[in-house]
Amino acid sequence: MNNHFKCIGIVGHPRHPTALTTHEMLYRWLCKKGYEVIVEQQIAHELQLKNVKTGTLAEIGQLADLAVVVGGDGNMLGAARTLARYDIKVIGINRGNLGFLTDLDPDNAQQQLADVLEGHYISEKRFLLEAQVCQQDCQKRISTAINEVVLHPGKVAHMIEFEVYIDEIFAFSQRSDGLIISTPTGSTAYSLSAGGPILTPSLDAITLVPMFPHTLSARPLVINSSSTIRLRFSHRRNDLEISCDSQIALPIQEGEDVLIRRCDYHLNLIHPKDYSYFNTLSTKLGWSKKLF
C-alpha cells in the first residue's frame, strides 16, 4: 500500500443486480491490498458482507480519501452532488450505458485503479450549480446539480413565458418549453441534445439553452460562471418545476423566482493517466474521426 490514498469508499447503486459483482470484487481486492475500505450501507446489505465498515455518502465523504463510484453516469451524478461537499477525490467504474463520467472499464478496473492508487492520475475540479426557488421574505428551497438545472412544465407539456436576468440585468424574455442551464460537465448531456455547445471541462462558463423556443431568433447563450441567473415568470402558474440532473425536482409556486449560481464547492474528479477528453468525445459520442 502507498501513501496516496489510505481510506477508500465504494459507492453506487447499479441498475442491474449482476453489476454488484464489481462492487464485491473491488471490496475484496482493496482489502487484500491493505486499504481501509468503507462500503455504502445499501451495497453492503445487498452483498451480505460480514464485518465490513459501512457508511452513508456523507460519512464516506468525511472519512475517505477516494470514492470509487460503480455504475453509470446517473450513479456518478447522484453520489457526486453529496461527495463534492467534502475533501475527497472521486473516480468511476462504468457499469452503465454511456459512461461519460465513469472512466474505468470493469474488465480492466483492477489494473487501471492500481495505477491510480499509485498516484498516476489526472485531477480535475468540476463546478456545480446551486438552484434556489424563492420568494421575498420566504424560506428558500435549494438543490445542486453537476450537469444542469432545467426549467420545464410539471405534468403537461406547454409553452412557458419567462424572463431571464443575468446579475440582475434583464437579458431576454422567451416563450418556449423550458430552459436548460448547464455546466461544462453537463454540456455533453441534455444540453447537447437540445443543440447546446460543447464546453471543455476547464472553462469557467455556464450555457443557457432554450428548449423548443417559439421564435426563429433564439440561440444558446454562454456566460461567465461567476454570474447569477434569475428566472421570472409572466403568467403565474403552479405547474412549473426545475429539475437538477434529472434526479431532483423543485416545484415553483406562484410569485416565486428561480436563482441559479455557481456553488462554493466543487467535485474533485480524477481520471486514469491516459485519459483524453477529446478521445472520450470520439468513443462515447461519435465525435469526428481523424482523416490522416
UniProtKB/Swiss-Prot annotation:
GO terms for biological process: NAD metabolic process; NADP biosynthetic process. Keywords: ATP-binding, Cytoplasm, Kinase, NAD, NADP, Nucleotide-binding, Transferase. Its main location: cytoplasm. SUPFAM superfamilies: NAD kinase/diacylglycerol kinase-like. The active site is at 73 (proton acceptor). Its EC number is 2.7.1.23. It catalyses: NAD(+) + ATP = ADP + NADP(+) + H(+). GO terms for molecular function: ATP binding; metal ion binding; NAD binding; NAD+ kinase activity. Its cofactor is a divalent metal cation. It is found in: Cytoplasm. NAD(+) binds at residues 73-74, 147-148, 158, 175, 177, 188-193, 247. Signal peptide: none annotated. It holds the Pfam family NAD_kinase. GO terms for cellular component: cytoplasm. InterPro entries: ATP-NAD_kinase_N, ATP-NAD_kinase_PpnK-typ_C, NAD/diacylglycerol_kinase_sf, NADK. Involved in the regulation of the intracellular balance of NAD and NADP, and is a key enzyme in the biosynthesis of NADP. Catalyzes specifically the phosphorylation on 2'-hydroxyl of the adenosine moiety of NAD to yield NADP. Belongs to the NAD kinase family. This is NAD kinase.
